């Protein structure tokens, strides 16, 4: 079962929750990066939050280059989850705690995602661990949310370790169990990255990379 209907519904509920509770669209710190998601004026030189809404991509994002580079077939849900929309990260509440789903802010952000996905999968191979790919963060970024690439199940993963706690048998069911979390925009601290630097999708994910590479 594709996760796309669940993602579509969550995005609709997400923006409706902000409009109902705050009377405004959600806001996000783009840190100088333009996006078709931005509503209203945008000044790249001003460090301020912008109102945004998701925009369906005209051409679906592809991970064929990642698969070719790693000689690995990725679980097809990755195309539905990351390749359909431009969007800011999505905050959520759940029975497992608070967290955020990563999304792609613009085309450069998508390239950054691919580069860091390659880095993550190469690290899993180096550690002789089964391949996973990340979809978000849990508990203020202390834990990664990852997909088991062999069956599409959703797990909690700590940097450098094999996932031990399964949350859902599928990404669709996992997204369906989440509730939008209403919160003010937070400007994330910039931390060093092992691959391409980009302030969009990995503003918060950088904390995970710092922990991972600090251990090795």
Swiss-Prot record:
Transmembrane segments: none annotated. It is a peripheral membrane protein. Keywords: Cell inner membrane, Cell membrane, Membrane. It is found in: Cell inner membrane. GO terms for cellular component: cytoplasmic side of plasma membrane. InterPro entries: Syd, Syd_sf. It comes from the Bacteria. Belongs to the Syd family. Interacts with the SecY protein in vivo. May bind preferentially to an uncomplexed state of SecY, thus functioning either as a chelating agent for excess SecY in the cell or as a regulatory factor that negatively controls the translocase function. This is Protein Syd. It comes from Shewanella baltica (strain OS223). The gene is syd.
């Amino acid at each position: 079962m594709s996760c796309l209907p669940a993602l579509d519904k969550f995005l609709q509920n997400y923006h409706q929750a902000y409009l109902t509770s705050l009377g405004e669209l959600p806001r996000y710190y783009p840190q100088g990066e333009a996006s078709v998601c931005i509503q209203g004026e945008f000044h790249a030189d001003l460090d301020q939050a912008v109102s945004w809404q998701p925009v369906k991509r005209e051409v679906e994002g592809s991970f064929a280059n990642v698969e070719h580079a790693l000689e690995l077939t990725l679980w097809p849900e990755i195309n539905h989850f990351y390749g359909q929309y431009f969007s800011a990260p999505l905050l959520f509440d759940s029975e497992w705690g608070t967290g955020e789903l990563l999304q792609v802010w613009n085309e450069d952000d998508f390239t950054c995602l691919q580069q860091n996905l390659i880095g993550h999968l190469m690290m899993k191979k180096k550690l002789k661990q089964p391949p996973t790919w990340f979809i978000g963060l849990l508990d203020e970024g202390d834990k990664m949310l990852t997909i088991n690439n062999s069956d599409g199940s959703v797990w909690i993963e700590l940097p450098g370790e094999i996932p031990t706690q399964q949350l859902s048998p599928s990404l669709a069911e996992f997204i369906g169990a989440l509730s939008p979390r209403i919160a003010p925009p937070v400007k994330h601290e910039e931390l060093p990255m092992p691959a391409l630097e980009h302030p969009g999708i990995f503003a918060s994910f950088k904390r995970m990379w710092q922990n991972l590479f600090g251990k090795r």
